[in-house]
From Swiss-Prot:
This protein's record includes keyword Cell wall biogenesis/degradation: no
The protein, known as: Large ribosomal subunit protein eL21
Keyword Nucleotide-binding attached: no
Organism encoding this protein: Haloquadratum walsbyi (strain DSM 16790 / HBSQ001)
InterPro entries: Ribosomal_eL21 (IPR001147), Ribosomal_eL21_arc (IPR022856), Ribosomal_eL21_CS (IPR018259), Ribosomal_eL21_sf (IPR036948), Translation_prot_SH3-like_sf (IPR008991)
Amino acid sequence: MPSSNGPMTGTRDKLSNSPRERGMSPPQRAIQEYDEGQKVHLRIDPSVREGRFHPRFNGHTGEVTGKQGRAFKIKIIDGGKEKTLIARPAHLRAQE
């Protein structure tokens, strides 16, 4: 049987928490608000299924351009090309 080519292939390490971070993620992370123009780091929280972006962009840094429902629109540069991702706040971390 041929191997799958779905969007989650090769994510064993990307979508696994370290032992300290296992279990339920903090609820305040899921309701975090970000301002337009604020820089955020994209980091998938494996314990939250909804509002994820494609794992290819895990580890990127982008800029919040707006809101879409409960999620945020994030502008990133990928290979010299501007792209817009939509992700919920559970998968975003503010840049200090």
